[in-house]
Amino acid sequence: LLDSDAVLDAGHIGWAARLSQRYPTVEVRVGDAQLEAADSVLLAALVRGLVLTATAAPGPAPEPELLDAGLWQAARYGLGGRLMGALGDSSAAADQVGMLLEHIRPALEDSGDLDYVHRGVQRMLVSGTGAERQRAAYASEGWDGLTSLFGSALTAEA
């Protein structure tokens, strides 16, 4: 893409996750606009667990088609639907999240994130994601409900 002048620089290539060109970090570009600071911290802890797990014991790379389908399902159905796993299996989102947490459990324990991640995931499974909560607030109370949600969520402690 760079050689063909299709993009200006590597920063414009839109992978869902990639190594940073400038910093010793992994950039994740899906689900990165969270409603609450606590959700952003939860996402960061999950990504750290995934990265530490993958670097400690790399497994086989999932098929790109499965990644694309899984990403589409997650964007479309969120935590309320069925999601595809890395091997193409499909089950309730809560079950897939549970399998993910079990997979990265050693890394979460080593980094001290296990309890925080479990509480955050449980909160999302019960209360909904930020997107789900915004849709529900708007459906029940219109703009006033959305404004009220933003007022409480955007000022909540992490």
Where on the chain are the PLM-derived regions?
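C-terminal accessory/tail domains of diverse enzymes
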Residues: 1-158
